[in-house]
Amino acid sequence: MLVAAAAERNKDPILHVLRQYLDPAQRGVRVLEVASGSGQHAAHFARAFPLAEWQPSDVDQRCLDSIAATTQAQGLTNVKAPLHLDVTWGWEHWGGILPQSLDLLLCINMAHVSPLRCTEGLFRAAGHLLKPRALLITYGPYAINGKISPQSNVDFDLMLRCRNPEWGLRDTALLEDLGKASGLLLERMVDMPANNKCLIFRKN
């Protein structure tokens, strides 16, 4: 099983945000997590919302194996087998998920460590797969209207772009535009620890 230190640090702050939008007592809530990584988030959140159906996914086979091992080791029955999913694929190829069937699409720490086309694919799919009034929630470090702060995020962005020119902190203004193109409005921006943010998009 993979263990990501960042996931251990941020899983509770993110859960605090999710609890403001999901009811643990509600049955049948369908959640898709894109780029689930180690599976630590899926396991933590599925335990907190035991009546919801959690669908983890990733493009990396090592992550898929870790997700399966993590959720099985914890005996979680509300987590489905992880999907092999490349976020750049058309939504029709997202594991048979039906249009307007998801209550939440969750994406943690993907946008800044992947090419922009991945974020574009995420928003396109969200426009098709989310139910009306359902949510896309993303988490990570962002530029805000062209400005990156504090200096640690500026340095992080530079490091990412040196590692891969297609990586880097995405601007919330760009994400707002991508959202609007898919019928999603940025409803709220939540300040998180370590200079990260949760962005809450709601489907019209």
UniProtKB/Swiss-Prot annotation:
InterPro entries, per the entry: DUF938 (IPR010342), SAM-dependent_MTases_sf (IPR029063)
Keywords noted in UniProt: Acetylation, Phosphoprotein
Gene3D superfamilies documented for this protein: Vaccinia Virus protein VP39
Keyword Heme set for record: no
N-acetylmethionine: modified positions: M1
Phosphoserine PTM sites in chain numbering: S149
Protein family per UniProt: Belongs to the UPF0585 family.
Protein name (database record): Methyltransferase-like 26
Species the sequence originates in: Homo sapiens
